[in-house]
Amino acid sequence: MLAVQNMKFGIFLLWWGWVLAAESTAHWPGREVHEPSRKGSRPQRQRRGAHDDAHKQGSPILRRSSDITKSPLTKSEQLLRIDDHDFSMRPGFGGPAIPVGVDVQVESLDSISEVDMDFTMTLYLRHYWKDERLSFPSSNNLSMTFDGRLVKKIWVPDMFFVHSKRSFIHDTTTDNVMLRVQPDGKVLYSLRVTVTAMCNMDFSRFPLDTQTCSLEIESYAYTEDDLMLYWKKGNDSLKTDERISLSQFLIQEFHTTTKLAFYSSTGWYNRLYINFTLRRHIFFFLLQTYFPATLMVMLSWVSFWIDRRAVPARVPLGITTVLTMSTIITGVNASMPRVSYIKAVDIYLWVSFVFVFLSVLEYAAVNYLTTVQERKERKLREKISCTCGLPQPRGVMLDSSYSDGEVNDLGGYMPENGEKPDRMMVQLTLASERGSPQRKGQRGSYVSMRINTHAIDKYSRIIFPAAYILFNLIYWSIFS
C-alpha cells in the first residue's frame, strides 16, 4: 500500500515537472517558440547547432556577410569586372601619362553680361581615353552604352572649368550623361553642361568694340605627368551650331588652343581653351545713344535764330537740352561696369554735352552784351536832346523795348532802309545830329557796338555746326 502511494506521488511530481517545463519554454524571456519543421526546411536541432556555433565564435548575434550592403552587380558590370579592379587609381598608374582626348560641341551661347563681365554657354563635353581594365570579350565587337550610374563606379577624368562662376549638368528628364565602352577598353564619356565663366572685357572702344572670351578646361588633380589632355581632332574638335546668335553681338570666330598652366604648389597642368570673338552690333546704340545726343546738340543751335531779347524762349531751350544730355549719359553708364578708363561712347556724349553747354553760355554772353548796350543807349538819350521835330513826350517811347505799333506813333516816321525798331533810336539821333562832328564820333562807336552784338549769334550759326561735323568725322574715322 505504501509502495502504491509512493508511485502515485512520483507520477504526480513528474506530471507537475513536465507542466512547469512546458510553461517555462513558452514564456521564458528571449526565447522563441519554433514551429515544427516544414518539409524541405532544416531540422530544428541543426539550426540550433548553427546558432550555437555563432556564439562559440564570440559574437552575440548572427554575423552578416561583409558586402551585404552592396548593391548587386548587373550582368554588364560583371562582364566589365568592376569588382576586380581598384578604379580609384587612374589607368596605368605608375607608368606614362594617360592620354585623354577632348572634343566639344557648342549648343548655344546664352548671354553676355558687360556688367558682370561673364558669359553663359551650353555645350556637349566629350572625353576619350583607354582603360584596359574595362575590356571585355565580344564576338561581334559591339560597344556597350551606359548611363550616369556606372560613372560613379569607374575612373573618369576630373575635368573642371577654370574661372567658372556657375556650372551644372542637365538632368531633364534624366542626367544628361553617357558612357560608352568598347571591347578593347576604349571609353567615351559625354555630358551636357551649362557653364557661366568670367571674360575679361576691354570697353575702351565701347560700343564699337570687339571682345575675345575663352572657356578653359583643365584637370583638377592630375598634372601633365599623370594625364595628357589634348584636343582629339585639333581645330576640328570644336563644333558649333550654325543657329547660334546674340542680340548685341556678331560671333565672328571659334577656335581652340592648348597651353600649360603652372601652380606653385602642385606643378604643371594641361589646359584647353575654347576661344571665340564677338563684335558688337552698333545699330542699337546708334538709335539709343548717338542719334538722341546728336539731336540734342542740333536742337541747342535753334536758339541762335531766336531773338536775343526772347529770354523765356532761349533759356528753357538751353536748360532742357542740358538736362536731356545728362539723362542720356546717366542711362548709358547705368548699363556698364564702373571702369576706371574712358570709353568711346563717353567721348562722344561728353563732347556733345560741351556743345550744348556752350550754346547756353553763348546766349548768356549775348544777353549780357545786349544789357550793356541798352544801358549805353539810355545814357546816350539822356545826353542828346531830340530835335527831330517830334513832340518831346514821344521821346520817352524810344526805348529798346518798344514795339512796332509804338514806332508807328512817331508821326509816321520809318527809316529809309526798313530797319527794325530796335535801331530807331540811333537813326533818329543820327538824323538830328548829322552835321555835328561830335555826334559822328558817337555814331561810329554805337554802330560798332551793335554790329558786334549781332555777330555773336551770326557767327555761332556757322561755327557750332561746322565744329560738330568736324568732330564727328574725326570720331568715326578713329573708332569705326
Swiss-Prot record:
Span list, region Disordered: 29-67
Annotated tissue distribution? Expressed in the cerebellum.
Q: What are the Basic residues biased-composition ranges?
A: 39-48
Entry binding sites for 4-aminobutanoate: R126, S190, E218
Q: List the record's Gene Ontology CC terms alphabetically.
A: chloride channel complex; GABA-ergic synapse; glutamatergic synapse; intracellular vesicle; plasma membrane; postsynaptic membrane; presynaptic membrane
Regulation of its activity: Inhibited by TPMPA, a rho-specific antagonist, when forming a homopentamer. In contrast with other GABAARs, rho-1 GABAAR is not inhibited by bicuculline when forming a homopentamer.
Against PROSITE patterns, the record matches this protein to:
NEUROTR_ION_CHANNEL (PS00236)
Q: Which stretches of this protein does UniProt put in the Extracellular compartment?
A: 22-281, 336-346, 480
Q: How does it sit in the membrane?
A: Multi-pass membrane protein
Q: Which residues cross the membrane?
A: 282-302, 315-335, 347-367, 459-479
Gene Ontology process terms (BP): modulation of chemical synaptic transmission
Cytoplasmic side of membrane: 303-314, 368-458
Disulfide bond entries: C199-C213
> Domains: what does the record tell us?
GABAARs subunits share a common topological structure: a peptide sequence made up of a long extracellular N-terminal, four transmembrane domains, intracellular or cytoplasmic domain located between the third and the fourth transmembrane domains.
Q: Which family would the database say this protein is a member of? A: Belongs to the ligand-gated ion channel (TC 1.A.9) family. Gamma-aminobutyric acid receptor (TC 1.A.9.5) subfamily. GABRR1 sub-subfamily.
Specify the protein name. Answer: Gamma-aminobutyric acid receptor subunit rho-1
Q: Whose protein is this, by species?
A: Mus musculus (Mouse)
